[in-house]
């Protein structure tokens, strides 16, 4: 069963409060999402492997540690997931970036893949799939399906806010993918919005309706 990690770092929780606030404008919203993504990336990369190397300081040669050849990839779910990418790349600039685009079929209400672009060495990379919201879980499940059928084997999912229903759906379909979130909210309402949530992340990020 996939593990769920809720980050309770004070800075993450502080910034998340203003992300939720209906009075937060588009520019500030984008900046806050970027900042929280950086803080979450710091937490999610705690287990990266290290190897010891020699480094020449101005005084003498010393033993020190560097990341041990780990290949990472960041995959935002379009469009709202794009707002989290730069925050992660600030910490791991060598990561390759893929994209997964999905839309909801008006008849079946199920997510449909319309765009996928991943690094060519997909089987060798560990991916962090990002989306600000995990509501019903439908889009996240389909995005992970897209990665796996193209050869991805090591995947983590990172979002700002999740509903219990979305977490359950993810664990049902992708029990091998751990979930990293800033807050686990109460529930979904009848329209599928997370309660209390933050509204529509994409609309608030890009100033659309």
Swiss-Prot record:
Q: Name one Pfam family in it.
A: UPRTase
Pathway listed for it? Answer: Pyrimidine metabolism; UMP biosynthesis via salvage pathway; UMP from uracil: step 1/1
**InterPro entries, alphabetically?**
PRibTrfase_dom, PRTase-like, Upp_B, UPRTase/APRTase, Ura_phspho_trans
Highest taxon of the source?
Bacteria
Q: A Gene Ontology molecular-function term?
A: magnesium ion binding
Described function: Catalyzes the conversion of uracil and 5-phospho-alpha-D-ribose 1-diphosphate (PRPP) to UMP and diphosphate.
User: What family, per the record?
Assistant: Belongs to the UPRTase family.
Q: What is this protein called?
A: Uracil phosphoribosyltransferase
Catalysed reaction equations from the record: UMP + diphosphate = 5-phospho-alpha-D-ribose 1-diphosphate + uracil
Q: Which residues does the record give as 5-phospho-alpha-D-ribose 1-diphosphate binding sites?
A: 79, 104, 131-139, 200
**Entries under PANTHER family matching the protein:** ADENINE PHOSPHORIBOSYLTRANSFERASE, URACIL PHOSPHORIBOSYLTRANSFERASE, CHLOROPLASTIC
Q: How is the cofactor bound?
A: Binds 1 Mg(2+) ion per subunit. The magnesium is bound as Mg-PRPP.
Lineage, uppermost ranks:
Bacteria, Bacillati, Bacillota, Bacilli, Bacillales
Q: What is its EC number?
A: 2.4.2.9
Q: Give the signal peptide, or none.
A: none
Q: Where does uracil bind?
A: 194, 199-201
Which GO BP terms, alphabetically?
UMP salvage; uracil salvage
Q: What Gene3D superfamilies is this protein classified in?
A: 3.40.50.2020
Keyword Glycosyltransferase in annotation: yes
What keywords were assigned to this record? Allosteric enzyme, Glycosyltransferase, GTP-binding, Magnesium, Nucleotide-binding, Transferase
Its cofactor is: Mg(2+)
Recount the known activity regulation.
Allosterically activated by GTP.
Presence of keyword Glycosyltransferase: yes
